[in-house]
Amino acid sequence: TASEPWLHWHDRLHRQLLLKPTLLPRGTTLLLALSGGQDSMALLGLLRDLRKHHHWTLQLWHGDHGWHPGSACVSKDLAKWCAQEALPLRVSRSTAEMTSGEAAARAWRYSELSQYAQQLNQTCASSNSCTVVTAHTASDRAETLLMQLSRGTDLAGLGSLRQSRPLQANASNGPRLVRPLLDFTREETAAICQDLQLPVWHDPSNSDLRIERNRIRLELLPVLESLHAGCSRRMALLSERISQVHDTQNALVDLSLQSINSPGNGLQRPPLQALAPDPRRTLLQRWLQQRGVRSLQARQLEELSRAIGPQQPPGERHLSSGHRLHWCRNWVQLNNRD
């Protein structure tokens, strides 16, 4: 196996994890999604060398999307290198139909990782659940912020690349997804690979300018960096602060909702009517999300908030989620559509 040096990169991640002990708990099984690119190889090098200090068990997973002719060779070479390093690697291969686009490929990867993590949970002796780890960086966070900003989004979208979250949005009790490298830039992961003498496999699809993220990475961000050096890291920090503001807002909104709950799991309408439009809309959105309504567009939410507001008659709306929102003088209620 490779030697285990202690460089300033190790010290930086080690100290970060000591400050956040629940991020990658001591003694847990870590399942690292390994593409073979510089980010995931850098994270592998750091986790491999730090595992004896945190008593982790390290498992690796690689997904072959088959997007370019050499992808099978990358999988083979990566598996050979991992075997030489005594690192356990599972390789999954998709079909063109399963990963026809970015969103489909991401869904396939997370589904495969979730299934493998659950298998590891059943077989590992650790009392901690298996944690899925990916190598997203501050650079990825800046790109995501720009994409979401240009598409049009809310606070949740601007702070969407979080350091820790459930792997599957609909399975809060399932495996968790953790991104330990969000404080590192892509330039730093390249330096880590060089300093640790790690091989890197390049994916030609990362240079495809038909992909939105690649255009932002290769064309837009270099211009912004030339104008304001270090802007990628500052945008990543802004995304983190936005996610914290969003969490704080949700906590305060939840407290407010508790005070206006009505019998039958509804809401008291008079307190909602007494609010200004913005806080009323925020409370209504959170209440609907908690009850499974997640597909409302901004204009629909605005219309619903206005309809239940002051000086408006009783009424109802049928939502695309299959729910029926109805309100009378004193309460607002949400039911499944008959």
Residue ranges and their predicted role:
Residues 2-39, 59, 65, 94-96, ...:
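AMP-forming adenylation/ATP pyrophosphatase catalytic core
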Residues 101, 128, 231-234, 297:
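Residue-level recognition of alpha-helical structural elements
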Residues 1-218:
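Core alpha/beta nucleotide-donor-binding catalytic domains of modification enzymes
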Residues 122, 155, 229, 233, ...:
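Charged, solvent-exposed alpha-helical segments that act as regulatory interaction surfaces
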